[in-house]
Amino acid sequence: MEEDSLEDSNLPPKVWHSEMTVSVTGEPPSTVEEEGIPKETDIEIIPEIPETLEPLSLPDVLRISAVLEDTTDQLSILNYIMPVQYEGRQSICVKSREMNLEGTNLDKLPMASTITKIPSPLITEEGPNLPEIRHRGRFAVEFNKMQDLVFKKPTRQTIMTTETLKKIQIDRQFFSDVIADTIKELQDSATYNSLLQALSKERENKMHFYDIIAREEKGRKQIISLQKQLINVKKEWQFEVQSQNEYIANLKDQLQEMKAKSNLENRYMKTNTELQIAQTQKKCNRTEELLVEEIEKLRMKTEEEARTHTEIEMFLRKEQQKLEERLEFWMEKYDKDTEMKQNELNALKATKASDLAHLQDLAKMIREYEQVIIEDRIEKERSKKKVKQDLLELKSVIKLQAWWRGTMIRREIGGFKMPKDKVDSKDSKGKGKGKDKRRGKKK
């Protein structure tokens, strides 16, 4: 899976790193292990390196160049002493062809580069993808041969020899190229910027590789969850298909019942329609006979009405002539009566005018008499009021005189003064008389 990630990243073989190797021991992994939590990978943190450095001194350049040349020689020796087996060569050849094919059509061969690492249970599960590979001609034949060779060897031995040797060769070639470029740069400009750039690029590739591993783990989990969802969806689909089949069978039964019912209804409707047509035909024949008789009656009635119409027309003409004569008579009489009534109306108008003048004179006389009567009444009212006033004044004067006379007598004023000698003898009588007078006044 590591090489698949590198090949998917479209990186050249020179930048593949060699710090992570794959070793498979024991039985192939199961789905339980894939569902577990992925193991944490130690990430080497490389400090930031400046892009440019100051040129080195000549002794340093010579010393470093000697060390690097010695390293290059050792790597070359390692290339010649490394054992290369047949399986390794064939795997490298197949890998190079797979890379070329993936460069042209990456989507059609997603599993070709990982076939040497896929265990047998996983290969059987991904069997539907193999027809896409076999149709590619000669490569498919070689692929099958290589697959047979791989499956004949133990899993640990095959994967370790092939993958490890390939990685060692790639790393050795990469280090040789980097060291050669560094030696050349030291000899030219006394700097080693190419080495720093290679390290920086390798660090970026390494981080990218870790990202690819994380995405691959996430993809595996998503695939497992999607497989579970697919199983659930298949179960639901099968249940739905079963229910739909039952529903279809029920509908078929209903359709058969409806067909039988419709056949019975069609027969009944056909018989009913034939009977209705026969009855309607009889009714139409009977109605036609009645209409013929009615037409004959109407023809005879029309002839009779035409004769009657002629007689009525002659009668109406005679009556019209009589009415015209009577109309002329009445018009003459109307003129005479109108003239006579007009004369009477004129006489009545003259009489009305004379009566109106007489009535106006009478109204004027009546108004004058009314005025005289009103004035007489007013005068009588005044005289009555005056008489009443005089009587009241007379009564008031009499009362006033009586009151004054009594006052003079009581107080002995004027001619009513009594002599002194008679006062003593007649004291008692005087008192009695005074009381009587007072009583009389009160009365």
Swiss-Prot record:
Residue ranges constituting the IQ domain according to the UniProt record: 393-422
Stretches with biased composition (Basic and acidic residues): 415-430
Region (Disordered) location = 1-34, 415-443
One Pfam family this chain carries? IQ
Q: Which UniProt keywords apply?
A: Calmodulin-binding, Cell projection, Cilium, Cytoplasm, Cytoskeleton, Differentiation, Flagellum, Spermatogenesis
Q: Identify the main location.
A: cytoplasm
Its function?
A: Component of the nexin-dynein regulatory complex (N-DRC), a key regulator of ciliary/flagellar motility which maintains the alignment and integrity of the distal axoneme and regulates microtubule sliding in motile axonemes. Binds calmodulin when cellular Ca(2+) levels are low and thereby contributes to the regulation of calcium and calmodulin-dependent protein kinase IV (CAMK4) activity; contributes to the regulation of CAMK4 signaling cascades. Required for normal axoneme assembly in sperm flagella, normal sperm tail formation and for male fertility.
Q: What family does the database annotate?
A: Belongs to the DRC9 family.
Note on domains (UniProt): The IQ domain mediates interaction with calmodulin when cellular Ca(2+) levels are low.
Share what the entry says about its subunit structure, partners included.
Component of the nexin-dynein regulatory complex (N-DRC). Interacts (via IQ domain) with CALM when calcium levels are low. Does not interact with CALM in the presence of Ca(2+). Interacts with the HSP70 proteins HSPA1L and HSPA8. May form a complex with CAMK4 and HSP70.
What's this protein's name? Dynein regulatory complex protein 9
**Native species:** Homo sapiens
